């Protein structure tokens, strides 16, 4: 059969904010900005969407580990990198936003997150993983949305009530609550809390154990375990993004008055 998917040798060199390394079928995905902690930009937003697609299409990937660089996973955002002046700009954001989380869910092998530090921008991304490990320094907060007057409609509204339960999830989003690693563990958003030194070795230990399982067991386990989240995401993501866009446009108009 002709192989049409982009080979690892190509897509592993494709992204400026994502470092990709593979050993024994375990793919390590490290997000960064110039080798330091990831700054959330329009480029990082779009790159992750397309990188997740490349990963999903590569059947040589047996398990995926997702982690960050430096003291934080993603604790800073560059708002100036986003062009949000016209309906066409927002249409592009909605287009890419749908692909970001849907492409992550389209990966048909188990995904392990190793959250190396605070994450205030898109904290839903790591907690969508099948196994979530957190460093003791990790914190989780949805910073750029409701605390800033924006609807948390880009998938946060789907993921956090799913992970924390309806009441805790809504409270988390509406109050800007920051969860430390131990609280996230108690709430079920995190599976293990480890020291910074133990974090990646533990992720690799789990990944290698999963990689030894039969191919179809690995792939189909991922599919059945994410089915409910995929179904809700498909139903609610686009509407949430549209509402987020309207609220953001309204906020921008108010600030200009």
UniProtKB/Swiss-Prot annotation:
The active site is at 124 (nucleophile). This is 6-oxocamphor hydrolase. Inhibited by copper and mercury ions. Also inhibited by thiol active reagents, such as N-ethylmaleimide and hydroxymercuribenzoate. EDTA has a slight activating effect. Hexamer. Dimer of trimers. It is an enzyme of class 3 (hydrolase). The keyword Hydrolase applies. Catalyzes the carbon-carbon bond cleavage of the bicyclic beta-diketone 6-oxocamphor via a retro-Claisen reaction to yield the optically active (2R,4S)-beta-campholinic acid. It is also able to cleave 2,2-disubstituted cyclohexa-1,3-diones such as 2-methyl-2-propylcyclohexa-1,3-dione and 2-methyl-2-butylcyclohexa-1,3-dione which result in racemic keto acid products. Transformations of the bicyclic diketone substrates bicyclo[2.2.1]heptane 2,6-dione and bicyclo[2.2.2]octane-2,6-dione yield (S)-keto acid products. It comes from Rhodococcus sp. InterPro entries: ClpP/crotonase-like_dom_sf, Enoyl-CoA_hydra/iso. It comes from the Bacteria. Signal peptide: none annotated. One of its GO terms (molecular function) is hydrolase activity, acting on acid carbon-carbon bonds, in ketonic substances. Changing residue 154 to N: 100-fold decrease in the binding affinity. Changing residue 145 to A: Very large decrease in the catalytic efficiency. 100-fold decrease in the binding affinity. Gene3D superfamilies: 2-enoyl-CoA Hydratase, Chain A, domain 1. Belongs to the enoyl-CoA hydratase/isomerase family. Its EC number is 3.7.1.18. Keywords: Hydrolase.
């Amino acid at each position: 059969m002709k192989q049409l998917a982009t080979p690892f040798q190509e897509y592993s060199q494709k992204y400026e904010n994502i470092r990709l390394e593979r050993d024994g079928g375990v793919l390590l995905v490290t997000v960064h900005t110039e080798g330091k902690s990831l700054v959330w930009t329009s480029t990082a937003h779009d790159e992750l969407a397309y990188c997740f697609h490349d990963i999903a299409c590569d059947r040589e990937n047996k398990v995926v580990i997702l982690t960050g660089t430096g003291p934080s996973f993603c604790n800073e955002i560059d708002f100036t990198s986003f062009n949000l002046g016209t309906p066409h700009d927002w249409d592009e954001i909605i287009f890419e936003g749908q692909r970001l989380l849907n492409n992550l869910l389209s990966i048909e092998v188990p995904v392990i997150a190793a959250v190396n530090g605070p994450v205030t921008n898109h904290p839903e991304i790591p907690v969508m993983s099948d196994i979530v490990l957190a460093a003791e320094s990790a914190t989780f907060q949805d910073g750029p949305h409701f605390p800033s007057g924006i609807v948390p409609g880009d998938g946060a509204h789907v993921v956090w009530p799913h992970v924390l339960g309806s009441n805790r999830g809504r409270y988390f989003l509406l109050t800007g609550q920051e969860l430390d690693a131990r609280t996230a563990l108690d709430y079920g958003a995190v599976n293990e809390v480890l020291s910074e030194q133990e974090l990646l070795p533990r992720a690799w230990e789990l990944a290698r154990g999963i990689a030894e399982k039969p191919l179809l067991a690995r792939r189909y386990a991922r599919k059945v375990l994410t089915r409910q989240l995929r179904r809700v995401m498909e139903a609610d993501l686009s509407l949430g993004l549209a509402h987020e866009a309207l609220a953001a446009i309204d906020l921008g108009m108010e600030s200009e008055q």
